[in-house]
């Protein structure tokens, strides 16, 4: 969308030029690292898997549900909604200078629109959910992953800097909505403790599947 490119041309262009200068100074060293970061965040698969693991334990189940919901909602808002509505082309397709930067850094071709960044939305949604439920000192480190992902997407000229900022906003909003839904779900489950399904959802612990059953006493052992 032209108005978006024109409005933030100075900011996005300045960030791209800084990234290109960094790429020239690094001599290609950062390209494989940023590609790896992008690969890890692809489709939000890592975050969904982490959420499933968290849901297997009673103490972390709420966090797992919130992470899963936040990342899922973020994907719906970005890939299935906002990208199509805004229709912003990838920077290497919209500007010859940015295309030259893209070719220099050796970034792979990416299809689809770019606003907001799906990668940044997903990692922000997951990091925010973890921050809400876990120790702030350690879970706060997840926001470093957000900055790293944003850096990698702009460095590879796959996104404008404004795409990544929008992704952060959408990710945080997705987490807020998912947190409210998670809270409602568990309030409902706790309201009906006599219901077997509710009890199962609240108390199931995957570790119980791997615990050895106590051996029956041998004949004469207790005599």
Residue ranges and their predicted role:
Residues 50-78:
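Interfacial segments of alpha-helical transmembrane regions
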Residues 54, 78, 82-87, 131, ...:
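Membrane-water interface at transmembrane helix exits
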Residues 27-30, 59-64, 92, 134-141:
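Membrane-helix interface segments
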Residues 71-83, 149, 153, 175:
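Alpha-helical transmembrane segments of multi-pass membrane proteins
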Residues 36, 67-73, 165-168:
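Loop-to-helix transition at the N-terminal end of transmembrane alpha-helices
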Residues 102-223:
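Membrane-embedded catalytic cores of phosphoryl/pyrophosphoryl-handling enzymes
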Residues 38-57, 119-122:
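Hydrophobic alpha-helical transmembrane segments
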Residues 1-48, 80-109, 198, 214-215, ...:
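N-terminal transmembrane-helix/juxtamembrane module of multi-pass inner/ER membrane proteins
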């Amino acid at each position: 969308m032209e108005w978006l490119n024109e409005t933030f041309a100075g900011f996005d262009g300045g960030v791209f030029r800084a990234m290109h200068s960094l790429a020239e100074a690094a001599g290609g060293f950062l390209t494989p690292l940023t590609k790896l970061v992008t690969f890890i965040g692809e489709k939000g698969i890592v975050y969904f898997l982490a959420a499933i693991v968290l849901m297997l334990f009673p103490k972390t189940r709420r966090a797992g549900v919130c992470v899963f919901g936040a990342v899922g909602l973020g994907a719906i808002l970005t890939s299935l909604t906002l990208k199509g509505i805004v229709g912003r082309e990838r920077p290497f397709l919209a500007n010859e200078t940015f295309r030259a930067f893209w070719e220099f850094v050796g970034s792979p071709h990416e299809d689809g629109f770019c606003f907001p960044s799906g990668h940044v939305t997903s990692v922000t949604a997951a990091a925010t959910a973890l921050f809400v439920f876990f120790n702030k000192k350690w879970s706060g480190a997840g926001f470093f992953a957000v900055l790293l992902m944003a850096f990698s997407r702009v460095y590879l000229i796959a996104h404008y800097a404004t795409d990544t900022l929008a992704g952060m906003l959408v990710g945080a909003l997705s987490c807020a909505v998912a947190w409210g839904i998670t809270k409602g779900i568990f309030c409902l489950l706790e309201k009906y403790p006599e219901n077997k399904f509710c009890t199962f959802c609240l108390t199931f612990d995957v570790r119980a599947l791997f615990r050895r059953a106590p051996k029956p006493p041998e004949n004469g052992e207790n005599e």
